[in-house]
Amino acid sequence: MQSNATEHAALERVAPRGTALRIAHAVKRYGEREVLYGIDLEIAPGEFVAIVGRSGCGKSTLLRLIAGLEGIDGGSLHRDGAAGGGLHDDARVMFQDARLLPWKRVLDNVALGLPRTHRAQAAEVLAQVGLAERAGEWPARLSGGQRQRVALARALVHRPRLLLLDEPLGALDALTRIDMQNLIEGLWQRLGFTAVLVTHDVAEAVALADRVVLIEDGRIALDARIDLPRPRHRGAPAFARLEEAILNRVMQRKADPDEVTDARAHVARPSPWEVSAAAVGWAV
């Protein structure tokens, strides 16, 4: 089987078919405690946005609002120009836990919710994630990375226009994690869906995203466009500068946002940076 890295390098991005998102002045409360307030964010169809921030800052809460798993307490959320509310058939969420059914074989896990006549579609998507030969096996026989591939196939078999990723790779070893990042990026380029990723890993955010958004204490503190060419090389000086600048901003709340802008100025393909709390782009 051809390596993911080789396949990834050869892919060209298709025309986006993803969901457009617009969040304005969003507020979320639990009792009297506000966990999100003043969130303003727009995500273009087919855009890949990564959300970073410390634990408890509100990243996953925002993801649940976008997914329709929880209601918004103030402001508005629109999908493709229409007010969003509740679960949508064209959106799927992938979690850190693959949540496979142990009593169903791999192909049956991918085909959950599909008519029996669509099993060929499930087999096709399983092949896209590199596991066609494991279709008849039980989930218990798979590695952690393979289980996440099955979970990804189960999400993509429904042909979502919006894929929400809530720390899906956090429990994987470093090499498997990079392999999965390449797979996700390649499928995103090929299929054109909108992707929103919540992650604690700044390197992962820089590797995958068109934009990296930092949330601090329920507010957007940084929105940085990543204009590095794809596929991205972690050892490249421009990549390292961006990763370090964003990580410093995450870890040192009073750090100067201009540090991120300065790092961006060294990238070979210059373009304007958007670093503000008003021009937001959020993600899982």
Curated annotation (Swiss-Prot):
Q: Does the keyword 4Fe-4S apply?
A: no
Q: Which Gene3D superfamilies match?
A: P-loop containing nucleotide triphosphate hydrolases
Q: Which ranges carry the ABC transporter domain? A: 21-242
| Protein keywords | ATP-binding, Cell inner membrane, Cell membrane, Membrane, Nucleotide-binding, Translocase, Transport
Name the principal localization, coarsely classed.
Answer: membrane
Q: Which reaction does it catalyse?
A: ATP + H2O + aliphatic sulfonate-[sulfonate-binding protein]Side 1 = ADP + phosphate + aliphatic sulfonateSide 2 + [sulfonate-binding protein]Side 1
Its record classes its membrane topology as:
Peripheral membrane protein
Residues of the signal sequence? none
Q: Which residues bind ATP?
A: G53, R54, S55, G56, C57, G58, K59, S60
Output one GO MF annotation: ATP hydrolysis activity
Enzyme Commission number: 7.6.2.14
Q: Which Pfam families match?
A: ABC_tran
Enumerate the subcellular locations listed in this protein's record, separating them with semicolons.
Cell inner membrane
List the GO terms this entry assigns under cellular component, sorted alphabetically. plasma membrane
EC class, as a word, reads translocase
> What does the UniProt function comment say about this protein?
Part of the ABC transporter complex SsuABC involved in aliphatic sulfonates import. Responsible for energy coupling to the transport system.
Assembly mode: The complex is composed of two ATP-binding proteins (SsuB), two transmembrane proteins (SsuC) and a solute-binding protein (SsuA).
Q: What is this protein called?
A: Aliphatic sulfonates import ATP-binding protein SsuB
From what organism does this protein derive?
Ralstonia nicotianae (strain ATCC BAA-1114 / GMI1000) (Ralstonia solanacearum)
